[in-house]
């Protein structure tokens, strides 16, 4: 039988040092959230497709398959909607501060270079309408990045209500909205100029400026306020100012008024995290006050933060933060009747491990191959050194 030894597109193996580093990062992040008072939650990797088939997730690239009863199921592409399902269907009392970590899966196109399997960690703050919920998410993200020693990172803020207000006033068709979204995401000056000419409105000056409205928070927000009198947009800008003033003492904060998240469920402040050594954002989140409505008749305010732990592992590696695993310095060869003594000796001796070879000569050969400097033999007679590497 010839097995296919290739991996599916967008997946990869992690070995030894990288796998250990990824494991430690996940532990650090979870521990940090626990210290801030978040309660851990876990959801299945497999969900029914209905959880992700709402208008909020129309663009999601899902791994779909049928279960044994013919029902359509998917591998979760994010954690937020499953947590929304849990909160809406279990009757847990609100408000809540939840944390999570686990695998997510997105069926990206081949040759795009994107990872289809990612390890994600994050928090969900549900039931708090106050702007302090956004502030907590941003502070938590900054705190995690500092704990992981990520160098030269920057937090970028946007506001989903700005884009929503613009398309509401323009009254665009679905196709036109998709085209407009693409122009905004690409910061296409020429394309937006052409769009405004074909779709004139009272927001022309503001829309034309959107591709340039990114950078230092205070200057950009002041410029944006001078370009419009629309109350909805001005309210969003003032909300951004409040958050910038609250969190700017902790990190470098910038804004991008053309920031449009991939998921449509965001309703308020949105944010991303970048670093000099990263090609793309590794932190994202925002407010989504209507997300839970797809699971229940009532809504609840919510804010979330997600971290791409694979990207953070790569960042730590590039920054030289990941330490080499502590090497084994002593190999313990033992006779079976002396196993209790060998086990006790290993527990008491740092950086030691048991040998699984039947003969001492094989244990010594293994030690030489893996550069283990010393081998001892534990028998009923006691402990004897049988190999010691010469020091140069």
From Swiss-Prot:
Location in the cell: Cytoplasm
Pathway the protein acts in: Amino-acid biosynthesis; L-histidine biosynthesis; L-histidine from 5-phospho-alpha-D-ribose 1-diphosphate: step 1/9
Molecular function per GO: catalytic activity, acting on a protein; histidine-tRNA ligase activity; transferase activity
SUPFAM superfamilies: Class II aaRS and biotin synthetases
Any one GO CC term of the record: cytoplasm
Nucleus as UniProt keyword: no
Gene3D superfamilies, per the entry: Bira Bifunctional Protein, Domain 2
Keywords linked to the UniProt accession: Amino-acid biosynthesis, Cytoplasm, Histidine biosynthesis
Function: Required for the first step of histidine biosynthesis. May allow the feedback regulation of ATP phosphoribosyltransferase activity by histidine.
PANTHER family according to UniProt: ATP PHOSPHORIBOSYLTRANSFERASE REGULATORY SUBUNIT (PTHR43707:SF6), HISTIDYL-TRNA SYNTHETASE (PTHR43707)
Record's miscellaneous remark: This function is generally fulfilled by the C-terminal part of HisG, which is missing in some bacteria such as this one.
Family: Belongs to the class-II aminoacyl-tRNA synthetase family. HisZ subfamily.
Protein name (Swiss-Prot/TrEMBL): ATP phosphoribosyltransferase regulatory subunit
Lineage: Bacteria, Bacillati, Bacillota, Bacilli, Bacillales
Gene that specifies this protein: hisZ
């Amino acid at each position: 039988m010839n097995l296919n030894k290739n991996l599916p597109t967008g997946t990869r193996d992690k070995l030894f040092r990288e796998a250990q580093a990824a494991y430690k990062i996940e532990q650090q992040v979870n521990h940090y959230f626990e210290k801030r008072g978040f309660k851990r939650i876990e959801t299945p990797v497999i969900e029914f497709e209905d959880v992700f088939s709402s208008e909020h997730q129309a663009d999601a690239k899902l791994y779909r398959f049928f279960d044994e009863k013919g029902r359509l199921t998917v591998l979760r592409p994010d954690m937020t909607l499953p947590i929304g399902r849990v909160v809406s269907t279990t009757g847990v009392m609100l408000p809540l501060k939840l944390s999570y970590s686990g695998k997510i899966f997105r069926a990206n196109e081949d040759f795009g270079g994107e990872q289809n399997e990612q390890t994600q960690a994050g928090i969900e703050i549900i039931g708090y309408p106050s702007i302090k919920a956004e502030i907590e998410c941003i502070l938590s993200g900054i705190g995690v990045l500092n704990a992981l020693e990520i160098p030269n990172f920057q937090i970028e803020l946007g506001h989903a209500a700005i884009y929503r207000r613009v398309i509401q006033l323009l009254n665009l068709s679905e196709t036109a909205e998709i085209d407009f979204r693409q122009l905004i995401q690409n910061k296409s000056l020429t394309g937006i100029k052409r769009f405004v000419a074909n779709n004139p409105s009272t927001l022309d000056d503001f829309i034309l400026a959107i591709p340039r409205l990114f950078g230092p928070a205070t200057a950009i927000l002041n410029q944006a306020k001078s370009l419009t009198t629309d109350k909805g947009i001005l309210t969003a800008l003032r909300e951004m100012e409040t958050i910038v003033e609250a969190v700017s003492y902790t990190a470098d904060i910038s804004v991008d008024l053309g920031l449009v998240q991939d998921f449509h469920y965001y309703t308020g402040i949105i944010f991303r995290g970048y670093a000099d050594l990263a090609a793309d954002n590794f932190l994202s989140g925002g407010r989504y006050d209507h997300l839970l409505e797809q699971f229940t008749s009532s809504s609840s305010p919510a804010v979330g933060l997600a971290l791409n732990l694979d990207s953070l592992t790569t960042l730590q590696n590039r920054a030289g933060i990941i330490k080499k695993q502590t090497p084994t310095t002593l190999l313990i060869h033992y006779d079976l009747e002396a196993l209790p003594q060998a086990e006790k000796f290993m527990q008491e001796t740092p950086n030691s491990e048991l040998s699984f070879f039947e003969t001492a000569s094989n244990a010594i050969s293994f030690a030489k191959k893996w550069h283990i400097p010393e081998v001892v033999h534990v028998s009923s007679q006691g402990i004897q050194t049988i190999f010691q590497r010469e020091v140069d």
